[in-house]
From Swiss-Prot:
Domain of life per record: Archaea
Pfam families: Arch_flagellin (PF01917)
GO CC annotations, alphabetized: archaeal-type flagellum
Lineage: Archaea, Methanobacteriati, Methanobacteriota, Stenosarchaea group, Halobacteria
Modification after translation, per record: Glycosylated.
Function: Flagellin is the subunit protein which polymerizes to form the filaments of archaeal flagella.
Protein name in the entry: Flagellin B3
Recorded name of the encoding gene: flaB3
Cellular localization per UniProt: Archaeal flagellum
Family affiliation: Belongs to the archaeal flagellin family.
Gene Ontology molecular function: structural molecule activity
Residue ranges listed under propeptide: 1-12
Organism this protein belongs to: Halobacterium salinarum (strain ATCC 700922 / JCM 11081 / NRC-1)
InterPro entries recorded: Flagellin/pilin_N_arc, Flagellin_arc
Keyword flag Glycoprotein: yes
Keywords: Archaeal flagellum, Glycoprotein
Amino acid sequence: MFEFITDEDERGQVGIGTLIVFIAMVLVAAIAAGVLINTAGYLQSKGSATGEEASAQVSNRINIVSAYGNVNSEKVDYVNLTVRQAAGADNINLTKSTIQWIGPDKATTLTYSSNSPSSLGENFTTESIKGNNADVLVEQSDRIKVIMYASGVSSTLGSGEEVQLTVTTQYGSKTTYWAHVPESLKDKNAVKL
């Protein structure tokens, strides 16, 4: 069963062969461990970045405090939203935000413009209500009015019509608000939406 090797040269060669195989196995294991460690580090950094991005999308939102419309000839020609930061949100720059307008006649995406409200077209503008900035929400106590010209987007909003407004911040978080025009606009200058 076991063979005895009596020649000294043959015994040394078997030992060197075993040593070479052992060293080769150690090298292969070291390379595999290095690849595994690099892959784990890459996945950890990707996971961390994805987590931070998801956290920003969830936490860096705005809250719509109120909405009202200006009435002209028994139609709503301006839609105004009062917005503030959600709890725990970072600074929100409304100039880098978009508003998706899905109304009775048209769906479009509005972008920021510093123009006067009557010349907005498919844009929106902002005015400070409370706070030092007219277009950046810095503190939770800040309030900014977002103004959209309904006639510039599609047409004025009549009695009973509604428009879906989705505000997307620079972080990618979305806040949706349904603005419902009351059934009666007679003898009114402004209405709650």
